[in-house]
């Protein structure tokens, strides 16, 4: 009988070059060159760290304080931006919405009657759109805002460019749902 290998729990570590490339490609679909504002902050330096296939955005000060926590006891640290799937793709989580909305390039505002539909996981239809960023291209990330409160409620990927979506019929999909604030309740 062979002894069983003792598996060490994964510790929080910097992203590899390939992981960084995949992560930044996905993030740039939503915030473009504004990634530099996340990486090169003037107020307090922040870093991206990988832990249990999830990417966290954490300040270096908090990271140094967390070094004394045993890795068995560390479940999360900072803001979770998303996770890597088993196939190696990166999927953004709703927890990154505050940063995406702050630095996003393209926005979609939806009508109050469509907010619940979007928050139940449905795509954004032409009839739901109150306003869209004029220069939004096809298959690009957008942050979805409420028209009444101007608060971010999720993010999506455009199905057509803003110019092309103006000519669509009311039942056509303008943006494909990716994540919304209703996930907090649905996933619990």
Predicted features by range, described:
Residues 2-188:
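Accessory RNA 3′-end/elbow-binding domains used by RNA modification enzymes
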């Amino acid at each position: 009988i062979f002894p069983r290998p003792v598996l060490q729990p994964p510790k929080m570590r910097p992203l590899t070059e390939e992981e960084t490339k995949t992560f930044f490609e996905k993030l740039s679909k939503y915030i473009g060159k504004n990634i530099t504002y996340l990486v090169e902050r003037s107020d307090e330096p922040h870093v991206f760290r990988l832990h249990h296939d999830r990417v966290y955005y954490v300040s270096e000060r908090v990271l140094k304080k967390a070094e004394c926590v045993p890795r068995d006891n560390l479940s999360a640290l900072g803001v979770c931006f998303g996770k890597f799937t088993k196939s190696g793709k990166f999927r953004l989580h709703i927890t990154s919405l505050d940063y995406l909305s702050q630095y996003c390039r393209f926005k979609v505002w939806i009508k109050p009657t469509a907010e619940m539909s979007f928050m139940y996981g449905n795509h954004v239809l032409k009839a739901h759109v109150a306003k869209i960023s004029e220069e939004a291209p096809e298959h690009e990330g957008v942050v979805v805002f409420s028209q009444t409160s101007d608060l971010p409620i999720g993010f999506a990927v455009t199905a057509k460019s803003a110019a092309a979506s103006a000519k669509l019929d009311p039942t056509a999909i303008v943006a494909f749902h990716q994540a919304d604030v209703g996930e907090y309740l649905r996933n619990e």
